[in-house]
Design a protein with these regions (language model features):
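Compositionally biased terminal segments of proteins
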Residues: 1-186
């Protein structure tokens, strides 16, 4: 098995373990980020496991993971908490770009089977909005979100994503790129 495949297997194992812990603790969550996209057909991710939790549940979620022996951190950014299953990073995101995780985040999610585990998976529009609004002068890299757009284009409500990201010049530039490459049409 290739190193990349082993890394992905470790990521999935950490996701499955954390899912079980959070479900057992009764903490509502939604799988987000690259794994939410992979669950719908995007390429494998190698970065981390992203769980979206309501702000009022974030510390309880982190404590539940800590109680199983996972190392935890409270980064200074103030919009997420972290846990580590070995060296696999698990982000507990409660206030991403675009606004805090709320009831609407959960309402838009779908229950899917991911790696033999049933869980709520974030809507693609939510993942793309968060990724586009995170782009900045310090981090202007369109490559990962462009890859997602190519692989998931037929599944995304692009009008919704455009509307929710309209205030971002980076999102505007991204949509110009998508239009010029004929990945999506206005």
């Amino acid at each position: 098995m290739a190193v990349q495949d082993l890394e992905f297997e470790r990521l999935l194992a950490a996701m499955k373990k954390a899912t079980g812990v959070l479900q057992e603790a009764g903490v509502p969550f939604v799988l987000g980020g690259g794994l939410a996209c992979w669950a719908r057909g995007a390429p494998k991710t190698e970065h981390d496991v992203d769980f979206l939790v309501r702000p009022e549940d974030a510390e309880r979620a982190q404590q539940a993971l800590a109680d199983t022996g996972m190392r935890t951190e409270k980064p200074p950014e103030g919009w997420l908490l972290k846990a580590y299953d070995g060296d696999v990073l698990i982000d507990l995101i409660f206030d991403p770009q675009g606004g805090p995780v709320d009831d609407q985040t959960f309402a838009r999610a779908d229950e899917l089977e991911v790696y033999a585990t049933r869980l709520q998976v974030a809507a693609l529009e939510d993942v793309l909005v968060q990724k586009l609004l995170a782009l900045s002068e310090q981090q202007p890299d369109f490559s990962s979100v462009l890859e997602l757009a190519r692989s998931l284009r037929e599944q995304v409500d692009w009008d919704e994503v455009r509307e929710r990201t309209a205030a971002s010049p980076f999102a505007t530039a991204f949509f110009t790129l998508l239009d010029e490459l004929e990945i999506v049409q206005k």
